[in-house]
UniProtKB/Swiss-Prot annotation:
Entry protein name: tRNA-cytidine(32) 2-sulfurtransferase
MF term (GO), any: ATP binding
Family assignment from sequence similarity: Belongs to the TtcA family.
Catalytic activity, reaction form: cytidine(32) in tRNA + S-sulfanyl-L-cysteinyl-[cysteine desulfurase] + AH2 + ATP = 2-thiocytidine(32) in tRNA + L-cysteinyl-[cysteine desulfurase] + A + AMP + diphosphate + H(+)
Species of origin: Pseudomonas putida (strain GB-1)
Complexes and interactors: Homodimer.
Length: 274
């Protein structure tokens, strides 16, 4: 790729800045960390690797990057693409081979979405591998829009106010997951991926499943953003500004003990002079 245009340069700087802010805000990467960057071959994970490699050069701390891709034995998976790309970059990498494709096809009825089971199997395998190579952080390519979509999916279909945190300690206690692109929009990532011409690998297992609940939520957010620009960013900021006393979760706030404070100063409203 040649010299960047003004807009391309702004895009690159914006993604790097936002990723750097997210990493700093949530203390995602610390001095001496070994970061396992999970690559799927999609636009998000390629962008994440690209940004992290830059930050590795300019950050005031030292950390390792190890790229990992999981070959799930999907028919037609181009095994040569990622190794060739990573060798050209000079990045240490591992290809983890695990036939989760056959498991998913066997357990999920025809016509049903495979994403949930596929993701659980993949996550478990990657957690184990991260432990094996001594990775202290596991970086995933989820972005701001993914986080907002997950929030609505949980609210609409699971009756829970929870999303996809920028940083998470796994249930096993042995893995810390980070999402460096948590502040980045999908629109910017798509534009950056197009600009860099990353060798995208399509998902043959679930890429054609258009009637997913996530796609419905995504379409809803796209329409909201079209009518009210900035709404997705506003929703994301709301996830960073939670007021437990203004919700209804008794585990987060002790509503049962609320009583009048006899020592509080009364606030009188002079209704006659309104």
């Amino acid at each position: 790729m040649g010299t960047l245009s003004v807009n391309q340069n702004k895009l690159q700087k914006r993604l790097r800045r936002l990723a750097g802010e997210a990493i700093t805000d949530y203390n995602m990467i610390e001095d001496g960390d070994k970061v396992m960057v999970c690559l799927s071959g999609g636009k998000d994970s390629y962008t994440m690797l690209d940004v992290l490699l830059h930050l590795q050069k300019v950050a005031p701390i030292k950390f390792e990057i190890v790229a990992v891709n999981m070959d799930q034995k999907q028919p037609g998976f181009p095994e040569h693409v990622l190794p060739a790309y990573l060798k050209e970059l000079g990045v240490e990498y591992h290809i983890v081979e695990k036939d989760t494709y056959s498991v998913v096809k066997e357990l999920v009825p025809e016509g049903k979405t495979t994403c949930s089971l596929c993701s659980r199997l993949r996550r478990g395998t990657l957690y184990t591998f991260a432990d094996e190579i001594g990775a202290t952080k596991m970086a995933l390519g989820h972005h701001r829009d993914d986080i907002v979509e997950t929030f609505f999916l949980n609210m609409f279909f699971n009756g829970a106010l929870k999303g996809m945190p920028p940083k998470l300690r796994a249930d096993d206690g042995r893995n810390v997951v980070i999402r460096p692109l948590a502040y980045c929009s999908e629109k910017d990532i798509q534009a950056y991926s197009d600009m860099k011409e990353f060798p995208i690998i399509p998902c043959n297992l679930c890429g054609s499943q258009e009637n997913l609940q996530r796609q419905v939520v995504k379409d809803m957010l796209v329409e909201w953003e079209r009518k009210h620009p900035g709404r997705t960013e506003s929703i994301f900021r709301a996830l960073q500004n939670v007021a437990p006393s203004q919700l209804a979760d008794r585990n987060l706030f002790d509503f049962t003990s609320l009583k009048i404070d006899e020592n509080a100063t009364p606030r009188f409203l002079d209704v006659l002079n309104i």
